[in-house]
Amino acid sequence: MITNQTERLNFASTKNIPDYPDFLDVQVKSFKDFFQLETKSDERGNEGLYNTFMENFPITDTRNNFVLEFLDYFVDPPRYTIQECIERGLTYSVPLKARLKLYCTDPEHEDFETIVQDVYLGTIPYMTPSGTFVINGAECVVVSQLHRSPGVFFGQSFHANGTKLYSARVIPFKGSWIEFSTDINSVMYAYIDRKKKLPVTTLFRAIGFERDKDILEIFDLAEEIKVSKTGIKKYIGRRLAARVLNTWHEDFVDEDTGEVVSIERNEIILDRDTIIDKDNVEEIIDSNVKSILLHKEDNNQADYAIIHNTLQKDPTNSEKEAVEHIYRQLRNAEPPDEETARGIIDKLFFSDQRYNLGEVGRYRMNKKLDLDIPMDKQVLTKEDIITIVKYLIELINSKAEIDDIDHLSNRRVRTVGEQLSQQFGVGLARMARTIRERMNVRDNEVFTPIDLINAKTLSSVINSFFGTNQLSQFMDQTNPLAEITHKRRLSALGPGGLSRERAGFEVRDVHYTHYGRLCPIETPEGPNIGLISSLGVYAKVNGMGFIETPYRKVTDGVVDLESAPIYLSAEEEEGKMIAQANIEMDASGKITASNVIAREEGDFPVVEPSSVHYTDVAPNQIASISASLIPFLEHDDANRALMGSNMMRQAVPLIRPEAPIVGTGLERQVASDSRVLINAEGHGTVEYVDANIITIKYDRTEDERMVSFDADEKTYNLIKFRKTNQGTSINLKPIVRRGDRVVPGQVLSEGYATQNGELALGRNLKVAFMPWKGYNFEDAIVISEKVVRDDIFTSIHVDDYSLEVRDTKLGNEELTNDIPNVSEEATKDLDENGMIRIGAEVKPGDILIGKITPKGESDPTPEEKLLRAIFGDKAGDVKDASLKASPSLHGVVLDKKLFARAVKDKRKRTQDKDALGALEMEFETKFVELKDRLVEKLFLIVNGKTSQGVMNDLGEEVLPKGKKYTQKMLYAVEDFAHLSKGQWVADDATNKMVNDLIHNYKIKLNDLQGALRREKFTITVGDELPSGILKLAKIYIAKKRKLKVGDKMAGRHGNKGIVARIVRHEDMPFLEDGTPVDIVLNPLGVPSRMNIGQIYETVLGWAGMNLGRKFATPIFDGASLDEINALTDEANVPRFGHTYLYDGGTGERFAQKATVGVIYMLKLGHMVDDKMHARSIGPYSLITQQPLGGKAQFGGQRFGEMEVWALEAYGASSTLREILTVKSDDVIGRAKTYEAIVKGETMPEPGLPESFNVLMHELKGLGLDLRLEE
């Protein structure tokens, strides 16, 4: 039999809804594309890690004698499993190695041979299959960043006098920013790196448009007139467009070098914009200039007035002057020579070493400016600069529009892969610098690539990224939804992004391009609102980092239902008419409605079907996963929906979770994509099941058995009470039985907020909306004792407590159960290592781990000397440093672990040597067995066939072409792991089998080698622990938390409240048939909050409970009122849930009908046990001597100035004096008070508070001579 999955009655009217993409694709795919490990080295694309290496290599020394070239990179398998890393507090990482080639180009070093070496570059954190990283034992997520895309942006601002100022900003991927902007005098300036401004014409001169003539010709503003005595007179009255210059060369002798240097001199004869008259004509003719430039007499002169104004402000006349002027502005110094000055511009914008627009920047630039520059040209070109200036002039003349920087075509996503690429770039650039330095130092020595490279350089950059970067975050692991949402989050904060303080309203607001890409609902409520958002359910990030969403193509009013949906970015969607997913259409996809409401950018016109270009693929396309899990979301106010989607992430996994009766149909996908559950990999039969393991025997064909080295049975280990980051627990249990048949993808386990393969964050409860004796005033909740008694909202929380054993100056610390001055009763549960036994009940103050630390030696007293003389041993030279249970800890010891480094003494070394020898022999035996099996299987496949010439990785022929395969010939092959994938025999089917067999052999061999390496390491080193730590003891304690007064609960519609009273079951209001309700909510919490979805859910839930059915009501396409009424009638439930209730205390009927039904409630992570706290005596602050604050410090309550005023107002002087002295920082007074209470004496007089002394010291620090006198 096959265990049947929950079938839900789906109310969706939209048909042909495509499957959701893998929800973790945004993390997993990005990381895969970055590392490209599954791609052959010669087929790797120019992206990710490969691209970063190619950008930084080859590296040469300063004389270009030695060259270090990059050939390839690869990684070794990780040393520890993911779980071992979490337990030991290590990073789950892989060793990265690069194959480098060092050769010499200098003929003098003929003896230097070319060296190819594999060099270790450090360990790199590696992504787990569920899209997380384990850093120092904690699971982390690298959040994708939404930042401004590289390219050119045109904007406007307003001067204080109201003038509009326009600007164009070029943002590169790497390099200096350049900005062009206008001022109130209509002059255009260029700013480089936001430093000093220079007229844009100076920049033109510097990039090769040297003369005024060249600049004016760019914009077609001038005509050139040949100077002749007769011809020039007809131009009297026209205006000069450029200066008339007299140019000559002067020779002078350089005093330093003695060389004769020629210098160009310019004399201005007539300035720009001079109107030619008779006198000017003579000057022009006398100056011997060949031609002059005049303004063109046409209409577009006015548009380009800004260029003429800028030329007037331009202090330079030639390219040389321009580059020198720019050098002076940027460097605040005189240029040493013209070459250096010219080099600064080339380096800034035209050198691919310093400047890079990136593929995205070039694409955006070409698109915006309508250019056709090749995509691989990723530096600025002259054409770019000219076109930007032209566009800016169009903008000034209202012939073009400014950019909307919040449009998603101007914002792109930097996924994990790209962020890592950037960090690797930084690390490799640092490494390249040190390599260059080492090459220069070791000029005449023989050296190898290993000598040049310091592995720490790269790993320190990567580790600091994971450890300190704002986007590398401690994963929210409260429940599977919290995990999946965290991995799909997009943040506008972080390095290179916005800051909370500077982000305005526009950036945070919902934009029309967010449709289907970013969720308009799910965002935090605090200062980060709108800056952190979530991907839509169907959204994908394309290769350039832009978010795409799918649509179905519409041609002449017919929707294409057959083809796969087309993914469009925000830019591609511009100007398209897009209809909703649930428009009326027939089976062939023809739109039947005469008019449809469509969406075009930010408008919603009603159009004919023939005008529609695309339709949405699904009604929930607009929302994120969390928002899509709220049934009847369309009936809720957006603010409450936001709270609902945020609170579902805080739901604590319960002992017995239950999937909602009223769901949205997305629950199964979330549970499976969270990667927590175990799924069957194929068709098979369950062989064995218990609480810890499930064994399945898979059906296999003969061919599959032939190419595999694994048995048909596969055993899956179930996770038992594993601690999550937030202290909730993952505990899986099987849902299949022995003998069951399974199909591919079938869920085999449940738990961790899932039931039967569906997300199950809470429980379905019978609810009544009515006031109950004032206990549910202001969102409070009244709940039945039955809910607590039946463990409906009971959850298990796991905490781990660890203690490190260090090597101190006075000697080693020690774990032991023999602790000085502690009773036998206190140590009865400790083992010989001082660790508490599994199953022991823990209460505050209990010893969890016993540890003693050597005490500092002081001169012994005569008594101590006598004791030592009698007993021999140093009595009491150790102190108790045990770990004790904190004040609020009640629980049961779930597990304990002890990690220790290997001890290095002579006996241990001998034992290690024997153990390593045995390991090697065992490996050798297994390896020979594996190779024998491979040869047997290979021979069965290729028996009687002829070799096609099999090569190894080095290109050598291992199995000669034309020879018939024999067993002896196959046994002779030494290394099957390094055979290249190729043609073994003539037919393809056999070749595929052989290649699959060798592929599986390599996997098996890798596993064997990895196990050998791990076991060797364990024997020689022991457990890997941070430096200075000899042992690490860990205790896991489970706490069972029942629902209590003060716990926070919520529904899925933003309806949250605190449990105010747990009422006896028999006192709860009951229905006509005598059934008491489980929970009573305040009806006044509904109308003002406008979240009517909870009422729809309540009524439909009651019908579902009575009928024993579950429903899927997708958002924006859910059950209508008529459908709900039909079901309530069928279930014999009153319409709208209106029914009379009876008082549980008196049995009398209440006067009014109330809404009754079944609602899905969650218990949130804000539990009263974590917040309740009381203190009598405890730790004090060192300087002020006042009690510390907060539960974590076992602190007190701050009695602030307002509280003091309150007591003053009551005239409670004695209470006030007590609070400000003995209860706070009167050190002597509080000790005396404690003594008086213990002895039962009268309270002493308070003394002087320590804070008064602090004030005195501060005043003395100001140089005031302060003395207290009686």
UniProtKB/Swiss-Prot annotation:
It catalyses: RNA(n) + a ribonucleoside 5'-triphosphate = RNA(n+1) + diphosphate. It is an enzyme of class 2 (transferase). One of its GO terms (biological process) is DNA-templated transcription. InterPro entries: DNA-dir_RNA_pol_bsu_ext_1_sf, DNA-dir_RNA_pol_bsu_external_1, DNA-dir_RNA_pol_su2, DNA-dir_RNAP_su2_dom, DNA-dir_RNAP_su2_hyb_sf, RNA_pol_bsu_bac, RNA_pol_bsu_CS, RNA_pol_bsu_protrusion. PROSITE patterns: RNA_POL_BETA. Its EC number is 2.7.7.6. One of its GO terms (cellular component) is DNA-directed RNA polymerase complex. CDD domains: RNA_pol_B_RPB2. Transmembrane segments: none annotated. GO terms for molecular function: DNA binding; DNA-directed RNA polymerase activity; ribonucleoside binding. Keywords: DNA-directed RNA polymerase, Nucleotidyltransferase, Transcription, Transferase. It comes from the Bacteria. The RNAP catalytic core consists of 2 alpha, 1 beta, 1 beta' and 1 omega subunit. When a sigma factor is associated with the core the holoenzyme is formed, which can initiate transcription. NCBIfam families: PRK00405.1, rpoB. Belongs to the RNA polymerase beta chain family. DNA-dependent RNA polymerase catalyzes the transcription of DNA into RNA using the four ribonucleoside triphosphates as substrates. This is DNA-directed RNA polymerase subunit beta. It comes from Flavobacterium johnsoniae (strain ATCC 17061 / DSM 2064 / JCM 8514 / BCRC 14874 / CCUG 350202 / NBRC 14942 / NCIMB 11054 / UW101) (Cytophaga johnsonae).
